[in-house]
Regions:
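C-terminal scaffold of the Radical SAM
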Residues: 170-179, 184-204
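Conserved Radical SAM active-site core
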Residues: 47, 51-177, 186-187
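Functionally constrained cores in energy, signaling, and assembly domains
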Residues: 11, 29, 37, 79, ...
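Flexible, acidic/Gly-rich N-terminal and inter-domain linker regions that tether
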Residues: 1-78
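Short N-terminal micro-motifs specific to bacterial/archaeal maturation
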Residues: 22-25, 103, 130, 181, ...
Length: 204
């Protein structure tokens, strides 16, 4: 007999999601949300950051996506939100205009929440955050708003595999599916092609 799946974020203790949001915003003020450890107050400036993202996330596009794994796509698509900018500098990136040039528009958490609810209304089976590592606070804030307004589908964290442990702890029991796109098993290649240190240690 089929059972109804309930997303992890709906099972958090009362007030826990808000606490995670508050913690994440504090970390953004001395940013250590990825292993770059830029320690820049991103609520005030993007100068000195690698990801070039500030207090507001930049969204390149959102909509039902049918190019993901079949278990995510189902019949109506994976509800994908593509975030602009990135904490990696991959020379081979297929979305260079998004990840390196930052094409897209700034979106407040309320707007991202509205996107999530729209994707749910369109029948998408999940919310798929693509390139999320540098916008964890913004995502958590949006999830908190969307959950209060009726979001009831699973969350997918579609990452490049360069996430700080603190970020993963903030996302624990919020995200349902982690989908790391691991790019390197050789540290020298990570430095050469993505200008990143400790990549292999970070994704383990």
């Amino acid at each position: 007999m089929a059972t109804t799946f309930e997303p992890a974020y709906l099972n958090l203790p009362a007030g826990e999601l808000k606490r995670r949001v508050d913690q994440a915003w504090v970390r953004l003020e001395d940013c250590d949300l990825c292993p770059r450890d830029c320690h820049v107050n991103r609520r005030q400036t993007t100068k000195g950051t690698v990801c070039r993202a500030g207090e507001r996330a930049v969204v390149a596009s959102f909509g039902p996506h049918f190019g993901e794994e079949s278990c995510l796509v189902g019949r109506h698509g994976s509800g994908t939100i593509f975030f602009s900018w990135c904490n990696l500098r991959c020379q081979f990136c297929q979305n260079y205009d998004i990840s390196q040039l930052g094409e897209g528009r700034e979106a407040a958490p309320e707007e991202i929440a509205a996107m999530m609810l729209d994707l749910q209304e369109r029948g998408c089976h999940n919310i798929n955050f693509v390139t999320p590592s540098h916008v964890v606070p913004q995502i958590l804030a949006a999830v908190a708003i969307a959950a209060e307004r009726g979001l009831r589908i699973p969350l997918v964290y579609n990452t490049g595999g360069y996430d700080a442990l603190i970020s993963l702890k903030l996302l624990d029991s919020v995200v349902d599916i982690y989908m790391p796109d691991v790019k390197y098993a050789d540290e020298s290649l990570a430095r050469k092609y993505s200008k990143v240190r400790n990549y292999t240690a970070a994704h383990k």
